[in-house]
Structure formats: C-alpha cells, structure tokens
C-alpha cells in the first residue's frame, strides 16, 4: 500500500531477473528502521528520492513482471535483446471478452404471458385468502415478480388493518433510541428528493 501510493517505486528488488535484464534497482526506502517501522507511512513520505521515473510492475500481472509484453520499452535497458522484438498490439477479441453480466430479472427477458383471466384470478385469490396466497406464493405460481403481483392486486382491507396493528404492536416495544433512529431515517429519505 505504501509503495504504490507514495511514488512509483518497486517492491520487486530481490529477483535475479532485475540483475539479468539490467533494470535499475529501485527500493522502497524510509527514514525510519525498515523492520521495526515498516508500517509507519510517514517515513516513506518524508524520504527524498532521486528525481526520475521508476517502473513498478503490478503484483497482479499473470505473466510475471519480467515478461516483455508487460514491460514498456522505455523502461528496458538499451542493451536488452527484447527491445528489438515486435510488441503485440493489445487487441481484445470477442471470444476472449467475458459475457455481459445481466440482472436476475432480465436473464431470460421479460415475458408478457398473463391474460386478463389470470390477473382476475390473482386478484380473487389474494382477496379471498391473503395469508395463504401471499405475493411470493402467487409470483412463484404464475412465474411473475412479487412487484407485479402487488401492482395488479391489493389485499383485503381487513388484512391490511391486521398487518398495521401488528406493526404498531412491534413499534410499541421499540426503545427510545431505535424510535429516534427510524424517525431520522424517514427525514433523511424525504431529503433525497429535495435537491
């Protein structure tokens, strides 16, 4: 973390590849003791390096940091034999690219398979027995989303009152801290749309 953010210096100094290919030996240096104060970022910030550019390969390179395809030509030594090689152009082919990720609801695309009879049946079932025929149950039965079920049908007034009374009972057991937090949340939600 420290080496990447402070300056373009490399942690990769101990490898034989650096000596073999003549890369400049760069080291992350600090003004403090390296072993005892390695996590103290202030030492890395206060240290003054010689001006210039330092090549720091990414730790996540799959092919390794000594591969000629990943090292820019400007950072290769003048005597490096790989400098004369033709570098392949990074062209992404459609076969190599991953598929575009899609949401769960749009994997198979939207379907408009319900007719007026099915929608009337959904309304009737939800009005008759909302305890058994919940939105989730009806959505699974007809292959639609629970949101669509709530759009085309409403539960009975009696069921709505029962659910509201249950909610009031739960909220009556809330402590003062939770009640204040929920009120603050409601106020913040109102501010979302007042820009």
From Swiss-Prot:
<comment type="similarity">
    <text>Belongs to the mitochondrion-specific ribosomal protein mL58 family.</text>
</comment>
<feature type="transit peptide" description="Mitochondrion">
    <location>
        <begin position="1"/>
        <end position="18"/>
    </location>
</feature>
<dbReference type="Pfam" id="PF12824">
    <property type="entry name" value="MRP-L20"/>
</dbReference>
<dbReference type="GO" id="GO:0005739">
    <property type="term" value="C:mitochondrion"/>
</dbReference>
<dbReference type="GO" id="GO:0003735">
    <property type="term" value="F:structural constituent of ribosome"/>
</dbReference>
<keyword id="KW-0809">Transit peptide</keyword>
<keyword id="KW-0689">Ribosomal protein</keyword>
<dbReference type="GO" id="GO:0005743">
    <property type="term" value="C:mitochondrial inner membrane"/>
</dbReference>
<comment type="subunit">
    <text>Component of the mitochondrial large ribosomal subunit (mt-LSU). Mature yeast 74S mitochondrial ribosomes consist of a small (37S) and a large (54S) subunit. The 37S small subunit contains a 15S ribosomal RNA (15S mt-rRNA) and 34 different proteins. The 54S large subunit contains a 21S rRNA (21S mt-rRNA) and 46 different proteins.</text>
</comment>
<comment type="function">
    <text>Component of the mitochondrial ribosome (mitoribosome), a dedicated translation machinery responsible for the synthesis of mitochondrial genome-encoded proteins, including at least some of the essential transmembrane subunits of the mitochondrial respiratory chain. The mitoribosomes are attached to the mitochondrial inner membrane and translation products are cotranslationally integrated into the membrane.</text>
</comment>
<dbReference type="GO" id="GO:0005762">
    <property type="term" value="C:mitochondrial large ribosomal subunit"/>
</dbReference>
<dbReference type="GO" id="GO:0032543">
    <property type="term" value="P:mitochondrial translation"/>
</dbReference>
<keyword id="KW-0496">Mitochondrion</keyword>
<keyword id="KW-0687">Ribonucleoprotein</keyword>
<protein>
    <recommendedName>
        <fullName>Large ribosomal subunit protein mL58</fullName>
    </recommendedName>
</protein>
<dbReference type="InterPro" id="IPR024388">
    <property type="entry name" value="Ribosomal_mL58"/>
</dbReference>
């Amino acid at each position: 973390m420290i080496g990447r953010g402070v300056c373009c210096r490399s942690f990769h100094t101990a490898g034989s590849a650096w000596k073999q290919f003549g890369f400049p030996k760069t080291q992350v240096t600090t003004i403090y003791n390296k072993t005892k104060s390695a996590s103290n970022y202030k030492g890395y910030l206060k240290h003054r390096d010689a001006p210039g550019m330092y090549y720091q390969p990414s730790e996540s390179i799959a092919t390794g940091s000594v591969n000629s395809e990943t090292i820019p030509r400007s950072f290769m030594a003048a005597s490096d034999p790989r400098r004369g090689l033709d570098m392949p152009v990074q062209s992404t082919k459609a076969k190599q690219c991953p598929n575009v990720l899609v949401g769960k609801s749009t994997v198979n695309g939207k379907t408009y398979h319900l007719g007026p009879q099915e929608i009337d049946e959904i309304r009737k079932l939800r009005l008759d027995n909302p305890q058994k025929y919940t939105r989730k149950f009806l959505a699974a039965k007809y292959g639609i989303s629970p949101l669509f079920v709530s759009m085309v049908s409403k539960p009975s007034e009696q069921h709505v009152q029962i659910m509201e009374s249950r909610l009031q009972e739960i909220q009556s057991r809330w402590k003062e801290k939770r009640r204040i937090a929920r009120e603050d949340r409601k106020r913040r939600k109102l501010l979302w749309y007042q820009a």
